[in-house]
Amino acid sequence: MALREIIILPDKRLREISKPVAEVTPEIRKLADDMFESMYDAPGIGLAAIQIAEPVRLITMDIVRKEGNGKSDPRAFINPEIVGASAEMNVYEEGCLSIPEYYADVERPAVVRIRYTDLDGNVKEEDADGLFATCIQHEIDHLDGVLFVDHLSKLKRAMVVRKFEKAAKRGIKYV
């Protein structure tokens, strides 16, 4: 495993649309391992491969760790897609490792049905709700070049982007 640098807004690579993974290879498994290590180090509960400058449709998540009970449930999702969503919506305060120290309420479907491939090459479908639903939607957005701030008003989004552009010009590094 290797710790990888997480790219930060305004890095243009965050807007790239990630390419599908053709097959689960040892390289994809190694990338997932690197992503888990980088995600835990940050610390975070979800990471899309594009956030470490790898434009492939791979997500790692461990929402159990957020609860701080010492437990862990690391999961990897290859080529994840939302195949159904509830009409009911939830609002959750979101943050992002690529937009450090900024949090905002985002409204998303309360329940989504996802289809993905696991690290063993098995295609699976399952329903996600609560934090799992919010996190998987947030990470799938990354794979499509969408950031959580894109769900905010135009004014709020512009303020956040401007803040990070100024920080980048000044050479401010978020750690």
From Swiss-Prot:
InterPro entries: Peptide_deformylase, Peptide_deformylase_sf. GO terms for molecular function: metal ion binding; peptide deformylase activity. CDD domains: Pep_deformylase. Its EC number is 3.5.1.88. Keywords: Hydrolase, Iron, Metal-binding, Protein biosynthesis. SUPFAM superfamilies: Peptide deformylase. It comes from the Bacteria. The keyword Hydrolase applies. This is Peptide deformylase. It comes from Rhodopseudomonas palustris (strain BisB5).
